[in-house]
From Swiss-Prot:
Belongs to the cytochrome P450 family. This is Cytochrome P450 monooxygenase peniB. It comes from Penicillium patulum. Keywords: Heme, Iron, Membrane, Metal-binding, Monooxygenase, Oxidoreductase, Transmembrane, Transmembrane helix. Its EC number is 1.-.-.-.
Amino acid sequence: MDTVQSLINITLPQPEIEAPAKLEYDRTRILSIAAVVFLGYLLLRPLFDKRLPLPPAPTRLPLLGNLHQFPASNLWGTYKKWHNQYGPIMGLKYGQRTVISLGSHEVAKDLLEKRSNIYSSRPNFVVAKAFSNDANSALIAYDERWKTHHSLLSTFMNARMAAKYQFLQNIESKQALHDLMSVQGTEWMQVFHRYTISVTFTLAYGERIPELYDERILFIDELTETISSNVEKPKNLIADCFPTISILPSALMRWKKQGKVYHDSAMKFFLDNHAKALQKPGWNWVKESQTSEDANKLDREEVIYLIGVLIEAGGSTMKTFEFFVMASILFPEKVRLVQEEVDRVVGADRLPTWDDSPNLPYLHAFIREVQRWRPIFPFGVPHSNLKEDVYNGFRIPKDSVVLANHWAMDSDHKVFENADDFVPERWLEDSKLPFLAFGYGKRVCPGQHIAKRSLFIIISRTLWAYNITHAYEKGKKVEIDPHAIVQNILAGPVPFKGTFTPRDADRYRILEEEFSNIGQDEANIWDVCKP
């Protein structure tokens, strides 16, 4: 046996120590060669690509596409300039992403409405999905799950239910009008913010938020700011431009951990308020969801998140209120026309109501012009196409990010004469002008019926009650820059100061009386608002 073992040892020597190093060297060579081949493929592919071209755009570089041209500032203005140069549809490349920007109403309608079966999905934004755990109805793909979400939301937000909610909007607007009596500086912004949050919070959870700086409002603000700042961070945008790198571990992709922390924090807030809502004596969205067939098709936590995130979404109307105040200060001659109409129809001894709406055409034109002049979603909410498509000889690859460029469309001089000017009359002179504030096709804003009533009730009553003018400091007028806009996904003006002065003593008295009666009406909210 020892002899056999000796022979084996002689004929089968031990592996050399250098073998692992040699193996590592070979692996490195193979990876290097593969990388060179892949890079060469990417560089040479366009030369042999026989497919239809993408829509025109600034010159693209291999791998990067148009990343080197991504505007560091004035994003919307740059896109509009590009549309003027390249036409109403552009095909940009940001890394692995294809971005199709639609710069005219005609093209947007052709694709997002006439071909809505293709263009009703959402892009797979990996960072945003990490922060929502892929449960935000506004961001999920167009599939059976989205249809269930949409059906559930429709039970809360359809036109019939929105008509019932005006009782609550009436109460909340009276509080807002009273709060405006004592605000200073930029605090008026918080008045409208409280209004929008309290309306949706009351409907969702059965409890009003009467205080301007309630801790729940501050927490919702923190949630909104956290997700906005993280989604728009340049280093996080890289993950959306090159989504394949999202497979890397959390240690390298910090947004994964940040997204989980954010989602857990949001869910705790939603869970706590969801549980409280079930114990409320009156009706609310949480209770309504308990008997919904659509809710039963979804996970419990998904339903809780779906309802909770509506509070944040409802707050977006606040940005339109802020632009309304800006327009009121900058264009007082237009405000006087609104006030003359409201005084003629309503009089001076009561607040406007929704019943007055059909008789206030100039007011409606004024509101529409605010939404056109300063759209709060300058790029809309991005769509995505479920399959490759061809439009006017251009190829639109599957899963493209399709932007309805509201900023370019709403300032298109071919459609809106003197588009840079604030002209409410245009909506009275041409009823066929395109209006896109609430989106396109099957992904229109599900809360639009509630939002329209909120805009009417707040704006009509504010202009009935107040003159809105520049603020003064040390005897000097504080100027407002109409172009000072925060360039986020949701756009709003840079905070500015304004002055709200009751138009006369009688209106001041009426505001006080209406505010004092809120307590009597509050007890009836949930009986009036329920189906």
